[in-house]
Curated annotation (Swiss-Prot):
One of its GO terms (cellular component) is periplasmic space. The keyword tRNA-binding does not apply. The lineage of its organism: Bacteria, Pseudomonadati, Pseudomonadota, Gammaproteobacteria, Vibrionales. It comes from Vibrio harveyi (Beneckea harveyi). This is Autoinducer 2-binding periplasmic protein LuxP. The gene is luxP. It comes from the Bacteria. It is found in: Periplasm. One of its GO terms (molecular function) is DNA-binding transcription factor activity. Belongs to the bacterial solute-binding protein 2 family.
Amino acid sequence: MKKALLFSLISMVGFSPASQATQVLNGYWGYQEFLDEFPEQRNLTNALSEAVRAQPVPLSKPTQRPIKISVVYPGQQVSDYWVRNIASFEKRLYKLNINYQLNQVFTRPNADIKQQSLSLMEALKSKSDYLIFTLDTTRHRKFVEHVLDSTNTKLILQNITTPVREWDKHQPFLYVGFDHAEGSRELATEFGKFFPKHTYYSVLYFSEGYISDVRGDTFIHQVNRDNNFELQSAYYTKATKQSGYDAAKASLAKHPDVDFIYACSTDVALGAVDALAELGREDIMINGWGGGSAELDAIQKGDLDITVMRMNDDTGIAMAEAIKWDLEDKPVPTVYSGDFEIVTKADSPERIEALKKRAFRYSDN
């Protein structure tokens, strides 16, 4: 096992994950905190949520030219979230009668910073009306600040629902996603119901950055505080299935007596599932995160025990509706989060099928 692949975050007595978790959103507004602080934003977010759930109402006045939209996404993953997101986005744009031109680049998460940078600069040179991107690393943040400060391109930040406090005077056009903290709290509540106090567990993070902080540390904070669970180890991964497999094996070699592993993403979880099967450790409970097609298949096979399922197409639809409102000169909320549902391997095929129809109502058709 190549230790260079992994960074063991926790390996010493006295580490306090709960104290670290209080800093999870340092520098960010929590989703509900932001809406509480700015009631007019809550009203706009609620109105957008209603539009997402409703049938599309076409644009009142067609645009003179196609609007230019550029998308740079970390799409090369087992998780189908990003691909479905674009599919639902385009289908809703079509139903809203919005004339558009889309340029999209899918990259590997965490690995292709150079490619992302080139694609982003190309999007700016082409004078895109809207740029859809994500925010996970410091390098991403520097680029976002460049866009906010020096271009007319309107920025949609995907997969983040916690506005950056430093940008309060000039926020992006829209933060859109499924609130990582809320999804992680829902999983923490379910694990808390299932296991007794002082249960041993391990965590497999995503790559270093925002997603690991919010999905991982939010969970750690809640189960340690509410259930007195005892964290034995935590590893950053490379956000891939292989690194999830490697991290799970490394973790269990040092701490074999855990009752569950908390995984922060689909790819990491499915890699850990392979490791557990190879080691004959099906007694260890493992979760998914996101509830895409690969996770739901694993749940129905009994390989995964539980996941928090995003109503996936909500965010693609929300982006299309926000652009429509902007073209109609209507105010657009700063932030939008889609809905979650908890799914377990005990759920009936009928319930899972109903949730799939709701979550993938555009991207499956």
